[in-house]
Every structure is written in C-alpha cells, then in structure tokens.
Swiss-Prot record:
Family per similarity comment: Belongs to the DsrC/TusE family.
Recorded superkingdom: Bacteria
Pfam families in alphabetical order: DsrC
GO molecular function terms listed in the Swiss-Prot or TrEMBL record: sulfur carrier activity; transferase activity
Annotated Gene3D superfamilies: 3.30.1420.10, DsrC-like protein, C-terminal domain (1.10.10.370)
Protein name as catalogued: Sulfurtransferase TusE
Subunit structure, as described in the record: Interacts with the TusBCD complex. Interacts with MnmA.
Job of this protein: Part of a sulfur-relay system required for 2-thiolation of 5-methylaminomethyl-2-thiouridine (mnm(5)s(2)U) at tRNA wobble positions. Could accept sulfur from TusD.
Organism for this UniProt entry: Yersinia pseudotuberculosis serotype I (strain IP32953)
Length: 108
C-alpha cells in the first residue's frame, strides 16, 4: 500500500510487515480497509494493544485481550461483547491490524 508518498509493505491479509511503518496517521487508513471509522473507544483499544505488544512482544489473542482490558479498564470495557461492537470481525485481529502489529498467534 502507498501512504504519504512511500510504500508500506503488508502481508496478504493486510497486516503491516514492519510495525515501525505504523503511525497514528496511518491507523484510520487501516481501519477504513476494515470498514471501521475510528472513535475514541477504538483508539483506546488500539493504543492498549500497542502497549501490550511493546511490553510482552506479542499481539494479544482475544482471551488475553479481554482479560488484560478488564484488569486495566474494568468489566465494562474488558468483555468480548464490548470489544466485538467496536471490532465486529474480531477484536484481536482487527485491533492489532489497525495498530500495525503482527496477527495474533491464535487467530485464524
């Protein structure tokens, strides 16, 4: 894909091949490809998965994401129903893609 005059390499599923190519300016473009318009709740999850990746060097699968979100933000946001409303095709897959991170290992 081309963004701001340079080529950004992605895999066949649209995940960035190099997470250092990511920027907050690129996130809305990636979200649009997923049919998502980013709102503040989306950004909260995107920033959360980026912080998770930086701390643990892995993208969180859905169970891990729900548990970690519940610990940080409480049950209201740390549940799969809330996350699926934001990311209908799979919170772990879509949030990590929009965050410019590798696909979670346990996602098909």
């Amino acid at each position: 894909m081309e963004f701001e005059g340079r080529i950004i390499d992605t895999d066949a599923q649209g995940y960035l091949k190099n997470s250092t190519d990511w920027s907050e300016a690129l996130a809305p473009v990636l979200a649009e490809q997923e049919g998502i318009t980013l709102t503040e709740p989306h950004w909260e999850v995107v920033r959360f998965v980026r912080a998770f990746y930086q701390e643990f060097n892995t993208s969180p699968a859905i169970r891990m994401l729900v548990k970690a979100m519940a610990q940080k933000y409480g049950e209201e946001k740390g549940n799969s129903r809330y996350l699926y409303r934001l990311f209908p095709k799979g919170p772990a897959k879509q949030a990590t893609k929009i965050a410019g991170l590798p696909k979670p290992v346990k996602c098909i």
